[in-house]
From Swiss-Prot:
Belongs to the YbaB/EbfC family. This is Nucleoid-associated protein Bcep1808_1753. Residues 85-95 have a biased composition (Polar residues). It comes from Burkholderia vietnamiensis (strain G4 / LMG 22486). Residues 85-108 are annotated as: Disordered. Coiled coil: none annotated. InterPro entries: YbaB-like_sf, YbaB/EbfC. The keyword Disulfide bond does not apply. Binds to DNA and alters its conformation. May be involved in regulation of gene expression, nucleoid organization and DNA protection.
Amino acid sequence: MLKGNLAGLMKQAQQMQENMKKMQEQLAQIEVEGQSGAGLVKVTMTCRNEVRRVAIDPSLLADDKDMLEDLVAAAFNDAVRKAEATSQEKMSGMTSGLPLPPGFKLPF
């Protein structure tokens, strides 16, 4: 009986690994947009943290360089937070049946 349970667990683990791979491929296609300065700076990235686009309103180009750098950093950080939240939401469906501790983050 123990062998049967172990085989079942191994099969479950293999299926979950395949599902995780598919989910990673999907997350690589999902884009999120971070903004700062009331939308004057926008960073678009995938849920795998690959930046696709950076858009800067032309009105900022003549302004203070330090302020522009801060706005770009803030937009990037906003995009990262959105990517993490989207990834967590998508992954929660896959891990809902697993006995994981609260707040446990998978390493992807």
